[in-house]
Amino acid sequence: MEKWSSFRIHKNFIKSTKKSENSVFFWPLELNFLNKKFKSLQRSDKNFSIILKLFLKYFYRTFPHNYVFEIRKTKKRLECLFSNKLFFQLPEGMSRFYIKLCNIVKKISRTILAATVSCQITYGACCIQDFLARNFGYLIVFHYGHSCLVSILNCIVLVIYIFVEIKYDFSFLPQSLKRLFCRRNDRIMITSTIQFSSELKQIKTYLAKQFNFLEIPQTKPLSPGELLGCTSFSIKNQSGVIYIGDGRFHVESIFFFNPNIKIIQYNPFTRSLVLLGFKFTDAVSEKENFIEKALFFTKSCNFIFGALGRQGSSKILRIIKFLSTLKKINYSIYTTTELNNNSLNILSGNLSNLWIQLSCPRISLDWANYFKNLVLSPFEFGILTRSTRFNGNYIPMDFYAKAGKFWTSYSTLKNIFVLTKLDNNVLTTKNYNYFKNYI
C-alpha cells in the first residue's frame, strides 16, 4: 500500500504540471521515477501493467508528435517471443531515436535483456542484416522504416518489420496546386515513399474538390503509391505527378522511367512545393558511352555480388551466368559489402576492366563516373549481349516489380525465352534443360 500511495501522489503531481509552460522539463524526471518503479516491482505484480501504461504515455511525449513507431504492435510481438536479445536496424534519418527505442523495448518486454543497433547504414529494406545478426547470436531482427521487400520466409532469423508513419499537414495543397495545374480535368498521380503513404488516400479525397482525375499508382508487390529509388511505374496520358517526400533519390526513378513527365515535390518537413527537373539526355548519353566502351571487353567480365544485407539477388546472378555461357563470355564472381574504387582496384589485377554489379541498380546510373573501371548493371549487361533493346526513350526502373524482366528480382523462365529471340537465338531443348539447372 505504501508504494501504491506514493505512486498516486506522484501521478497527481504529473497532472498538476501538465498545464505548466515549462512542463517539458519535467518529463525526464517522470521517466526516471517510473524507471525506479519498474525495478522495484516484480513482473507479476498487479501494479506493473498500470505503471507500464503510464510509462508508455509519457514516453510517447519524448518522440516527435507526428511520428508513429507502432509501439503497441512491438509490445504484442515481444509478448510472444522468448529470446533475451534483439537486433535493431534503423534508417539513417531515424538513428537518433535508437536509444529511446532500445530503452522502451527493454521496459515493455518480460525477457529482453539486451538490445543492439546495427552501426551499418540501412539504405532500404534490401539491407536486411539477418546473416550478420545470426553470426552474432541474435535470433530476432527489428527493421524500422521500410516496406517488406525481402520476404521473412527467406530470412534465416525472425525479421519483424516496423512501419514508421510520419503524419504531415497537407491542407494548403489544393490552392497551391491550382496554380500549377490550371485545368480541372488534368490527370494527376500521387505518390510518396512508404513513410508518408498512409495519408495518400486522404490527400486524394481532399484534392478531389479541385481535380476530377486523381490516381494512386501501384507497382505490385509494393503498397499503393509507394515509390522506391529502384522501382517506379510507367506513366501514360498523365498531366503530372505529385511526389510527397524529401530528397531526390526516390523521385529520380520516375524521371528515368518517364523523362517527359511534370513532377511537383511536396516536402512535408519544410512544407514547400518544388517543380523538379532532370537532365535525362545527359544520363542516356553517358550510358551509351559506357556500353560502347564495354564492347571491347565482351570476351570476359567480372560479376560482383552485393553482400550488404540482401541487396544481391542470387536469381539474377544465375540468369546472367546462363547468358554469359550462352554467349561464350568468360566470367569471374566476387562478393563485397561496399562497392568503391579501392575494392575494385584490389580485385582487378590482371582481370577484365568490365564489372557487372548485382547490388543496387542505381549505382551504375548515379555513380558510374566515379569508378575507374566500367561498372554496369544487369540491364546494361543485357544490352551489351543483345539480350534486350535500348531505344533511349527511357531507362526501366522495375527492380522489385513482379512484372519485371530478367534483370529484376522477380524474373522468371518466360523472360529468358523473350530475350533470346531478340538476337535470333531461340532456345533449343538442350539449352532449355541447361537453363533449368541454373534457375
Which residue ranges define each predicted feature?
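Peripheral docking tails and interdomain loops at the edges
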Residues: 2-33, 40, 44-47, 51, ...
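Phospho-regulatory, Ser/Thr- and acidic-rich intrinsically disordered linkers and terminal tails
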Residues: 3, 58, 65, 76-77, ...
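A polyampholytic, Gly/Pro-enriched intrinsically disordered region
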Residues: 134-146, 184, 189-190, 234-244, ...
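Redox- and metal-dependent alpha/beta enzyme cores, enriched for Fe-S-associated oxidoreductases
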Residues: 203, 250-331, 338-346
